[in-house]
Amino acid sequence: MKRGMREAIIGNPVILQGMLYLVLKLMSLKFVLNATFRRLIKNEYGTFDRTIALQTRDKSIKLYVVFHDGRMTVRRGVPAHADVTIVYRSPQVIREFATLSPEEMLNYLLTNKLTFRGNLSHLSRFAYILNNFAPGKKGRPVKDGAAPAAGGHAPAVRTGLISRRGELRSTPGDRVKYLREPYLQAYTIGDFPGLRAQRELHFTARPCVCAERARLITQYFLDTGFEYDRSGNRRQPVLRQAQALKYLLTNKRPIIRENSMIAGTTTSRDVGVIIYPEGHGITLWPELRTVSGRKLQPYDIEEEDREILDKQVFPFWSDRNVREYARLSNNFPRYQELDERFVLYFMWKTVALSHTVADFPRLLAHGVMPIIEDAARRKEEAQDEQKRGFYSAIETALRGVLIYAEHLEQEAQRLAVQAGNADRYRRLADMLHRVPAHGARNLDEAVQSLWIFWVALHNESTNAGLSLGHLDRWLQPYFESDMERLSPGKEQEAYVFHALELIGNFFFRCQDHLPLVADVGNKLFGGSSSDQAITLGGVDRSGKSAVCDMTYIFLKVTEMLTVRDPNMNARYHPGVNSDEYLRRLVEVNMVTSATPSIHNDAAMIQSLKSVGFREEDAREWCATGCVEPTIPGRHFGHTNSMMFNMVAALEMALNDGVHPLMDEQIGPKTGSIMEGAFAAFEDFYRAFERQLRFLAYQTIDYNNSLGLAHQDIRPTPILSSLFEGPLDRAKDLTEGGALYNTSGVACIGLTDIVDSLMTIKKLVYDEKRTDFATLRKAVDANFEGYEKLHTMIRNRVAKFGSDEREVNLLAQRVIDTVFDIFYTRTNYRGGHYLVGFWSMSNHVAFGTLSGALPSGRLRYKPFTPGLTPENVRGVDLLSSIRTIAGLRPERMPNNIAFNVKVAPDSRDTHEETVNQITAYAKSYFELGGMQMQFNIVTTETLRDAMEHPENYRNLLVRVSGYNAYFVELDRDLQLEIISRQQMRV
């Protein structure tokens, strides 16, 4: 049969449906004939009794599958109430599926070739079932910690690590008391064998899925009940959660890693991927057989863990995770369906609400016992049953933390007897006998106390964006008290060495876990770790410099280790913090190539004051996750509640409410360009604003419904115990217990919006060089056949970052518009929505799902990251600095990410380069710029890293707010970073 005829036959929907029906029927026989396959849908834990429908958008193909009591039945048509309906854009898409693995099917969700209605958990299980029928798709053999690091590359041991060091020296300034040379240039990573060993493990151990947490909490609820206890009484969510956490922490394996100065681990693996089935854990279901073999960020998984997740854990949580609870509670809302198209916005509450910072100084000063005693007293005094339940929850959860510490103490005592280095384990046991139950007396106890509580928090809340705050100033009193007891000279110098080693150990403890990212998420959040932000410097509550000895200890550790997490952020207050401090921040950026991010303290404080934060509280702000501000212990802001694609609103305004990729009427009809709408630019701007408002309100409604789901599914009693407000109000943080209760928005695509609007305004309305219909046609054609118009757009229209007054005013107008839209709405806890302009890696993901734009950006190309000008003619570093610094911080209270890619001149010395970059940074901050982050690396180096990744294992880059290892990024994201304008200094 000729190929054309064969294609025509297979392409016939009737024939294609018949073929698909036959394939599914053959599958159904497998469940009858093979007990192993039958266990996929019926086993000792229960049965998969669901209906899955499959149809094309034009309904030319309609089939459905019924799973019931261990059998699979295939039928024609689509039932009225399927649990999941999979909709294919066309019959051609169904044909393509023959060559895809089931987890690759989910990647089709990104491009909207595949959409679905119904329960995503059931779709994930169906994909896993299909995966078991796919030949040759199994992952690699599993052995925890034995293989190379994530990213798909396999460097030999001790190769590929870039080693650099600072050269500059300084004298004490700000509030430095003991460091005679604050830059600490006498020390290198070579002086710390233990840190070198841990760094080697970090870059060679493959992440491994850890089912410990998921298994324990699931077993607890199977034994005791979830919605109702075994007596039939409805369980109070916060108390239920506390009891589960106590069970988890009581039964969690106590581990003290070799070479570590700190006891306790987040997971039972060297580098563990934690599963939160009540959050987004079920997204791993389709990949349980293949995740260890995927190209980007592969995870090992043991067969026992795979079995327990598939058979017990994921089925239990299929309807009890936050996403599905919100769906069922709101009758399958449209705003949730739009989120699951991945093009318009991404809602982080489906994963976490952990972007916040606790009151760690309270923990360090007093320990857990006073909080337990306070909760017990309040419980006795409370008259209301719900309040008594809340206080009991605080007490119960914190006792779980102490039980975990007690088990670590016992493990240290055991190792002191059985292992070598008995003195080390005895010291750990002595510390664990005191902390975190009581206040810390020295730096070692403070770090140990902090770490145990940090482990507990990550077993309560998703390891995404939960941040550590001002560790330099919070640990400084313990450093000072230790130093005061030592003689100047060798004793104090030895202690500085010890402090560096201890903080280095803490950094690697923070690296012992990774967030779960499904393969489809690698395009959305490429290379991101847990983003545990630490904030240094700035001013204290009274407005005085907070730069201290520990600030420089942390900076030196950052320089020596050059790791992506913790995500280091530094506050710089012009006129208060010293030039020597700013110069050191720049030098560490130059050595590491990408960290820390630097923030203008004055601008951020003013921005927070303008939206209702008290000045004293605003002065204590610290970065959360990426760059977002949080007031530690007072402000529960979920600062990354959503990633909002503003460009989608522009595309919808250009298409009368239709989104081109989705090919559906999404927003309101606001006027057809092809029919002569929009007589003036203001008419089109109003259409854009209306589409923007429509999308924003969808996200707000969804965020609020997800927040209510968190109240019922996963309250946070441990986190609430270290906040001001919850105990006084007898309210969990998820219910509005904190003093400040905002929600943070990340607005993506501002540069692309401004440049597009300027093109429309200038060429269509002001200069009339083209008409709107022609411009729309050019955009639809990706400018093919409209090359002259494209050249005119790129060369004649002033761009964002050029410091042209008209462009700057338009940029501020767009910022004001989106600020007003969000700020005037309240969240489920009664707080405001605060906007910021940063993008993680979603500027690439959203860009690859979007068409060409009037700015001249071509189809499927990334948007510009954060609040960064595009790499075009007429935009240089100075004009960019003036443009960004001229925007009003008061309208961007969730902060910005201004990415600057710097290529040092090879003719300049190290000191000259540092001084030049420092001068630019200082000018930017003095002009009022909010934030600046660097990639100090040449384009040539990045291209070589793409070709020879084995030589660049620790090449650090700033994406947009967070750090990543360049060689672990998706190719599209690598190319986006390479394409950024390279500024010469």
Residue ranges with predicted function:
Residues 1-158:
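Feature captures hydrophobic
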Residues 77, 124, 138, 417, ...:
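Short linear functional motifs in flexible/disordered or boundary regions
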Residues 99, 111, 418-420, 484-485, ...:
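Charged, alpha-helical scaffolding/interaction elements associated with membrane systems
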Residues 106, 406, 472-473:
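Amphipathic alpha-helical repeat elements characteristic of tetratricopeptide repeat
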Residues 160-394, 423-985:
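Conserved catalytic cores of very large enzyme subunits
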Residues 392-403:
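Extended non-globular scaffold/tether segments
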Residues 403, 407-410, 414:
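Extended, non-transmembrane alpha-helical coiled-coils
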Residues 412-425:
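Short, Lys/Glu-rich amphipathic helical modules
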